[in-house]
């Protein structure tokens, strides 16, 4: 199972194209179901087998069975989960089909010799993950539903898709001034070491409750004592409201909470701060702040990050445009 997951982490989604439409007037055999059309994209078919043999879908089903038992697929909840997953993956297969069609239109598909060479290189890179152990590689392929041949075809598709995406985002540029602006607005991301603050808080439901808490603290009552008495955060209440050391760039905390905490000086206690969880009174027990790296030392990294973000935006916009211009028909009844 670990080997299969390792391979699936290397692979994305595969496309295996077949052509046959089963008759809806009779009960379908497994073979007929596999060949039934679940979508058409500009006249090209996506078949049930393409979805059922999709590595990510197979992984989802496997995980569900491990968690909920072998009969999970037969339960009402299981059927709903499977249907939702199939719909999501079908949308991805439709996107891939459009990208492959655009590969022909944009004339970015390499010649067969070059495409095979690139695919073989990727196969060798995957084998290297298994220390070039051919037996283990083949066992993993089998467990994920691939053969050497279908893996190579899948990789050839991915090479074409990558070239289409590169073509669609080739005009994206990031100037030094863009990087400078990002640097100026996100200084805490570029310190010599991560800035941290040791934080305690008291969480209550209403603003009135929070104001009463603040009044008690202003009257010099002990923060930890008040937290143990009134805080509704069960995770920190018994510790006197202590959350511990928090990285300035920690994305696990509410952004409003983080902004308020970072604005406080060491030893300071905030006014009520409203977040999705309620009202907080925040105390900064201590701070560790480090010098900010020079702009020139991080400029290229910032530009690379911003370019990737802009490329993603450009790609998303382009694929939406291509989808709108495509003739797409789905056959939901053939998904189950």
Curated annotation (Swiss-Prot):
Source organism's superkingdom? Answer: Bacteria
One GO cellular component term, please give it: plasma membrane
Q: Which InterPro entries match?
A: Foldase_PrsA (IPR023059), PPIase_dom_sf (IPR046357), PPIase_PpiC (IPR000297), PPIase_PpiC_CS (IPR023058), PrsA_foldase (IPR050245), Trigger_fact/SurA_dom_sf (IPR027304)
Q: Where is the lipid attached (N-palmitoyl cysteine)?
A: 23
One biological process GO term for this chain? protein folding
**Could you give a GO molecular-function term held by this entry?**
peptidyl-prolyl cis-trans isomerase activity
In this UniProt entry, which residues carry a covalently attached lipid of the kind S-diacylglycerol cysteine? Answer: 23
Location in or out of the cell = Cell membrane
Kindly indicate where the leader peptide sits in this chain. Answer: 1-22
Chief place where the protein resides: membrane
The keyword Repeat is annotated on this UniProt entry: no
Provide the catalytic activity annotation.
[protein]-peptidylproline (omega=180) = [protein]-peptidylproline (omega=0)
* EC number from the UniProt entry: 5.2.1.8
Q: Which Gene3D superfamilies match?
A: 3.10.50.40, Porin chaperone SurA, peptide-binding domain
Q: Where is the PpiC domain?
A: 194-286
SUPFAM superfamilies given in the database record: FKBP-like, Triger factor/SurA peptide-binding domain-like
Q: How does it sit in the membrane?
A: Lipid-anchor
Q: Does the keyword Membrane apply?
A: yes
The UniProt entry's sequence similarity note says: Belongs to the PrsA family.
Checking HAMAP family in the record gives: Foldase_PrsA
* Full protein name: Foldase protein PrsA
Q: Which organism does this record belong to?
A: Clostridium botulinum (strain 657 / Type Ba4)
């Amino acid at each position: 199972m670990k080997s299969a997951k390792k391979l699936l982490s290397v692979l994305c989604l595969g496309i295996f194209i077949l052509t046959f439409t089963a008759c809806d007037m009779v009960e379908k055999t497994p073979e007929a179901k596999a060949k039934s059309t679940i979508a058409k994209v500009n006249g090209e078919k996506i078949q049930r087998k393409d979805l059922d043999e999709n590595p990510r879908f197979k992984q989802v089903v496997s995980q569900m069975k491990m968690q909920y038992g072998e009969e999970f697929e037969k339960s009402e909840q299981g059927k709903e989960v499977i249907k939702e997953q199939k719909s999501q993956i079908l949308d991805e297969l439709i996107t891939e089909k459009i990208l492959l069609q655009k590969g022909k239109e944009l004339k970015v598909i390499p010649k067969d010799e070059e495409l095979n060479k690139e695919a073989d290189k990727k196969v060798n890179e995957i084998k290297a993950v298994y220390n070039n152990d051919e037996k283990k590689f083949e066992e993993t392929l089998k467990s994920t539903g691939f053969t050497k041949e279908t893996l190579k075809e899948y990789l050839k598709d991915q090479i074409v898709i990558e070239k289409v995406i590169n073509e669609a985002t080739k005009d994206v540029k990031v100037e030094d001034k863009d990087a400078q602006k990002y640097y100026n607005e996100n200084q805490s991301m570029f310190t010599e070491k991560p800035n941290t603050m040791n934080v305690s808080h008291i969480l209550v439901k209403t603003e009135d409750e929070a104001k009463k808490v603040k009044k008690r603290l202003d009257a010099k009552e002990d923060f930890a004592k008040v937290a143990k008495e009134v805080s509704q955060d069960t995770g920190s209440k018994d510790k006197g409201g202590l959350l511990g050391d928090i990285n300035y760039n920690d994305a696990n905390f509410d952004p409003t909470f983080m902004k308020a905490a970072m604005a406080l000086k060491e030893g300071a206690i905030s006014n009520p701060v409203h977040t999705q969880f309620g009202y907080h009174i925040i105390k900064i027990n201590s701070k560790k702040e480090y010098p900010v790296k020079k702009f020139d030392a991080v400029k290229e990294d910032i530009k690379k990050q911003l370019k990737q973000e802009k490329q993603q935006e450009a790609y998303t916009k382009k694929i939406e445009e291509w989808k709108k211009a495509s003739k797409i028909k789905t056959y939901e009844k053939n998904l189950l």
